[in-house]
Amino acid sequence: MTTLDSNNNTGGVITYIGSSGSSPSRTSPESLYSDNSNGSFQSLTQGCPTYFPPSPTGSLTQDPARSFGSIPPSLSDDGSPSSSSSSSSSSSSFYNGSPPGSLQVAMEDSSRVSPSKSTSNITKLNGMVLLCKVCGDVASGFHYGVHACEGCKGFFRRSIQQNIQYKRCLKNENCSIVRINRNRCQQCRFKKCLSVGMSRDAVRFGRIPKREKQRMLAEMQSAMNLANNQLSSQCPLETSPTQHPTPGPMGPSPPPAPVPSPLVGFSQFPQQLTPPRSPSPEPTVEDVISQVARAHREIFTYAHDKLGSSPGNFNANHASGSPPATTPHRWENQGCPPAPNDNNTLAAQRHNEALNGLRQAPSSYPPTWPPGPAHHSCHQSNSNGHRLCPTHVYAAPEGKAPANSPRQGNSKNVLLACPMNMYPHGRSGRTVQEIWEDFSMSFTPAVREVVEFAKHIPGFRDLSQHDQVTLLKAGTFEVLMVRFASLFNVKDQTVMFLSRTTYSLQELGAMGMGDLLSAMFDFSEKLNSLALTEEELGLFTAVVLVSADRSGMENSASVEQLQETLLRALRALVLKNRPLETSRFTKLLLKLPDLRTLNNMHSEKLLSFRVDAQ
């Protein structure tokens, strides 16, 4: 990012088009690109976007006190900015400065919508008109992964179908894209489409279901109510006292930001994180690559690194400090805390907390986990970060890696089990709702590993504690999905669970998991096809976690700066490993909108079961 306005409210949620007032000046998203693009599609690997959009509802819970504090300029009856130069300039700042992750809406009013547009093509949510994320015009629907108007939808479709190479921008690729001038610079318009999340791959997830639209409306109303309460009480979020880690037992504490999460155990984040420290010197690209790769290797420990020992040798090795052996394991369960077998969700939660050690003091949590005896615990971490008893590890013959695994070919012992604490099967007597609760809670044991990995990202601890918590709440599921991808056998359409039982996509789909698992398989296939190295996977995981357009950020400028650093390091590493595959970095970035969609689908599915249970 080259420039950034201190008033830039990245990730704003809802903006109402009113009849008076003005919008603060904002930095346009296009100014966040590099200046070395040559206009071709492949050159986007050098001028990549610095932040990426969430799912359609990914930013609905942002701090609304910011987005409601400014009102855009008035519009004339035909929907264009008023004739005054000040209004025109302010309108340009509003539409172009709206962040990619925001959901732009306007109250339905005859003076806000151009009379030339058919009302049947207007996307509404109970009287609120959604705006195009690219140009700010009235959105006609959910196209290519974002709300967009017919003009931008057709422009993006032509661009990708015909592989058009647009002329180089004459204004340093810093054009503002609004409705009245969107056709002036096609290169900047296409970049804007990509930066807000438009993707050919996103179309396969279909249009927004009715249930999701209803949830979006409910979250909008909740955001408005929260904004009114905050503005009336004159109590900004920044006045919250900073929580420092204490060496005592961890007790429950309220989350510092009103950002709901489907995962369990997020209330412990403030105690596990460190207060913001003074800014450290910006590390070099090589330092970022080495530090992130080391943290990823040591914290997200893979089966072929430390889970290849037999049960007998495991305890002995830990006692003696010698490296673990690589003999196959038996499959009986020895010493693993029993999983709950009743229908009590609280019991399941306590079982997970027991495995995680969430009630332990933060001081007992090691700063790093070297592969070997440093981690004194019965449960080890597999390739998805989930705790696993050593007796549940299966040492596969050399070279027998799961199909489409990014680590295929360079690992000796591969864990062939999906790390679910409680695997779903119809004979257990559990309802579909309880199975889905277990499915979501199975990700909980990896939360601590994600937190520890984040603390070792260079510059992450320089962020405010509020922003650290916000990033972790919003990005943990996506991080786990990246690491979970290798456990899907895309070729056979199966998943191997902890019981060593293979479940097909058809079997799991019969229990109501079809849509989400199909999307997971699809994402896993696309990610694994890139054959990322361990270093690339670690840096990509860091980029997924550090996204400046998350909801409720306090200091988005600092997050964007950190994200820029990680993106530069990832791009340098990808081009270094495969210099001839210039489009590989772009393909990798296009997985970010897919992750947002998966995150949204998981949240919606979990929410729907909870609503049905009430």
UniProtKB/Swiss-Prot annotation:
- Matching InterPro entries, A to Z? NHR-like_dom_sf, Nucl_hrmn_rcpt_lig-bd, Nuclear_hormone_rcpt_NR1, Nuclear_hrmn_rcpt, Znf_hrmn_rcpt, Znf_NHR/GATA
Q: Which residues carry this modification: Phosphothreonine?
A: 274
User: What GO cellular-component annotations does this UniProt entry give?
Assistant: chromatin; cytoplasm; dendrite; dendritic spine; nuclear body; nucleoplasm; nucleus
Stretch list, region Disordered? 1-119, 233-285, 311-345
Report biased composition (Low complexity) as residue ranges: 14-34, 69-102
Q: Where in the cell is it found?
A: Nucleus; Cytoplasm; Cell projection, Dendrite; Cell projection, Dendritic spine
N6-acetyllysine PTM positions: 191-192, 400, 591
Q: Region Crucial for activation of GJA1: start and end of each range? A: 49-284
What does the entry report about post-translational modification of this chain?
Answer: Ubiquitinated, leading to its proteasomal degradation. Ubiquitinated by SIAH2; leading to its proteasomal degradation. Ubiquitinated by the SCF(FBXW7) complex when phosphorylated by CDK1 leading to its proteasomal degradation. Rapidly ubiquitinated in response to inflammatory triggers and sumoylation is a prerequisite to its ubiquitination.
Q: Where is the composition biased (Polar residues)?
A: 1-12, 35-48, 233-243, 311-324
The residues the record assigns to binding heme are: 418, 602
Q: Where is the composition biased (Pro residues)?
A: 244-261
Q: Which UniProt keywords apply?
A: Acetylation, Activator, Biological rhythms, Cell projection, Cytoplasm, Differentiation, DNA-binding, Heme, Iron, Metal-binding, Nucleus, Phosphoprotein, Receptor, Repressor, Synapse, Transcription, Transcription regulation, Ubl conjugation, Zinc, Zinc-finger
* Binding region for DNA: 129-205
Q: List the disulfide bonds.
A: none
SMART domains noted in UniProt: HOLI, ZnF_C4
Which PANTHER family does the record match to this protein?
NUCLEAR HORMONE RECEPTOR (PTHR24082), NUCLEAR RECEPTOR SUBFAMILY 1 GROUP D MEMBER 1 (PTHR24082:SF113)
Q: What is this protein called?
A: Nuclear receptor subfamily 1 group D member 1
